[in-house]
């Protein structure tokens, strides 16, 4: 089998996440259908580096493709893009070594975008609309600083009791950085870590925004929950504001 690394971008609005599912439109499912059509039912396998959730977008998703033959990559890329929906596109395809490991990630970078200005119908699919006063960047940054570093994130995850009890998923994680900036009149919150748990970023974002508004959760309660104490906060920021920006592999 030949191995290829695909860089994929997509508008996740109309898809039920990354993972292929029967009778449901997903990013991996659409990619597999396109490859199957182009290769005329050749044997292949795809593995994504990040399992983005329903409604989440990406500009740098990485996909390992195992394929039984070595195609001309420029023609292969064009053919796959022609077979894909308009909201999913292959940016690049390159051959990689046989020992390449799609899980050998140095870090992943996600961003969450908030529009605290006038509603924009053209960008609405990619941002959270903020119905309050303009956001104070420094004040919001101070709240997000609580989440930086190594913490127990089980209460800021979408893991159910069975998953938590199995101990198969590590919930003590380190977030390297969270940066709150204003870009093109939007508030952009950028997260960097080796990996994230399901719903982790969206639960952090909504908790921080609620804390910013002095609603439902305080800074002290956030600190307690980051020690695994108490209950899960029952809020989750909308998926449409979240985007996978970058995946960097170890050398």
Curated annotation (Swiss-Prot):
Belongs to the tRNA pseudouridine synthase TruA family. GO terms for biological process: tRNA pseudouridine synthesis. Formation of pseudouridine at positions 38, 39 and 40 in the anticodon stem and loop of transfer RNAs. Pfam families: PseudoU_synth_1 (PF01416). This is tRNA pseudouridine synthase A. HAMAP family: TruA. Substrate binds at residue 110. Homodimer. One of its GO terms (molecular function) is tRNA pseudouridine(38-40) synthase activity. It is an enzyme of class 5 (isomerase). It comes from Mesoplasma florum (strain ATCC 33453 / NBRC 100688 / NCTC 11704 / L1) (Acholeplasma florum). Its EC number is 5.4.99.12. Keywords: Isomerase, tRNA processing. The active site is at residue 53. The lineage of its organism: Bacteria, Bacillati, Mycoplasmatota, Mollicutes, Entomoplasmatales. It catalyses: uridine(38/39/40) in tRNA = pseudouridine(38/39/40) in tRNA.
